[in-house]
Amino acid sequence: MADGKAGEEKPEKPQRAGAAGGPEEEAEKPVKTKTVSSSNGGESSSRSAEKRSAEDEAADLPTKPTKMSKFGFAIGSQTARKASAISIRLGASKPKETVPTLAPKTLSVAAAFNEDEDSEPEEMPPEAKMRMKNIGRDTPTSAGPNSFNKGKHGFSDNQKLWERNIKSHLGNVHDQDN
């Protein structure tokens, strides 16, 4: 029954003298197998025998090479065309180049930005004015290269703050004693 299975192909293996024909030898050569199902008599359920035979015949036919268009360069014909496009004539008059005339400027910068119509200055909200002014040590923003260790109320010197706190505590203790 093993010889009569339909759809199974076994390639012939040449036996070497002294070779056992182990799994290493089998791994070197690809083996084509097709799945065999016992329910439908050895045929695959998705493909019929007719479809398989048609595909095998199509695979056996030699395929025609695709037609490629000829690709080449015709040097002689191209040089003749380009030579007529560029020609140098000695003693010929040069064509005069026209200088483009510029239109006279009628609009000024003020007219472009409508400065004349807007006579009163823009009003800024007070928050924006506050940010633009430097209010001494009470600057709300501390940004820039020279603003290291600067808080909302100016630069914070920890030594000076410690001295101030000690003096205020001593003053409070001295006042409490009296």
Swiss-Prot record:
Biased amino acid composition, Low complexity: 37-47
InterPro entries for the chain: PCNP
Region called Disordered, residue ranges: 1-82, 134-158
GO biological process assignments: proteasome-mediated ubiquitin-dependent protein catabolic process; protein ubiquitination
Annotated compartments: Nucleus
Residue numbers bearing the Phosphoserine modification: S53, S77, S87, S119, S147
Annotated keywords: Acetylation, Cell cycle, Nucleus, Phosphoprotein, Ubl conjugation
Ranges of biased composition (kind: Polar residues): 139-149
Pfam families: PCNP (PF15473)
Sites of Phosphothreonine modification: T139
One GO term describing the cellular component: nucleus
PTM remark: Ubiquitinated; mediated by UHRF2 and leading to its subsequent proteasomal degradation.
Keyword Ubl conjugation listed: yes
N6-acetyllysine PTM sites in chain numbering: K64, K150, K152
UniProt function note: May be involved in cell cycle regulation.
Quaternary structure annotation from Swiss-Prot or TrEMBL: Interacts with UHRF2/NIRF.
Entry protein name: PEST proteolytic signal-containing nuclear protein
Organism taxonomic ancestry: Eukaryota, Metazoa, Chordata, Craniata, Vertebrata
